[in-house]
Amino acid sequence: MTTRRAEIRASRLQVREQIVSAATELVRTTSFAELTVDEVMRETGLSRTIFYRHFDDLADLLLRAGREAIEELFEAQRAFGEAPIADGPDAIRSAFVPAVAVYSRHGPLLRAIAEAGAADEEMSAGQQAVRQRFADLAEAALRGMPDIAANPPADLSETARALNLMNEAYLLEAFGRDARVPAETIVQTLTEIWMAVAHPGKEAHAE
């Protein structure tokens, strides 16, 4: 009996992974608004009914499919928060590498989750929490910079929020479907923008 239960559990996990894999592949070329349960299940060769044994709806599917990516984003946030970005371009560049790597690996899925957030309150709340954490970390990082302290912007909190939203929009545009440019170019571009704000007049190239 125990063996039978284990086989059933393994079979359910296999089916769930098959559905997640199909959806992950489809969002490379399909927006969330265009994605349908029928299309996902057609990719798996399984019936529509089976989908609802595992997921409530497409938003639920994306949340589960994106769990790894979201966990990696939180880890990237931690790395950004610990980076000594007041030290200059190399430190800023290193701070961005983890987040750029996450978007490089999971860009289409993160784009689909962002699109789904426009229509799903739970997903929207989750995205807002991630954005706020990044904005808070950005503000704390900027506040500790001597050049910012000497010549502060009119509203440091809003500057941090604007930089964070720019980061997110740029990364989603660059990696939301097939990668448009190399990750190294993205890292350097973000480094140059942040250097212009945090260390005006200083070079953003590697030291």
For the regions a language model picked out, list residue spans one by one.
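Helical hydrophobic small-molecule/effector-binding pocket
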Residues: 89-114, 129, 133-140, 164-165
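Hydrophobic alpha-helical connector segments
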Residues: 60, 64, 78-105, 151, ...
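Amphipathic alpha-helical linker/stalk segments
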Residues: 3, 29, 65-93, 111, ...
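Short helix-capping/turn signature of helix-turn-helix
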Residues: 55, 115-120
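Helix-turn-helix
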Residues: 14, 18, 26-60, 64
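Short hydrophobic clusters on alpha-helical segments that form packing/core surfaces
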Residues: 15, 19-27, 73, 99, ...
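An amphipathic alpha-helix signature
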Residues: 20, 93, 97, 132-143, ...
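Hydrophobic alpha-helical bundle segments that form small-molecule/ligand-binding pockets
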Residues: 83-85, 105, 120-121, 131-163, ...
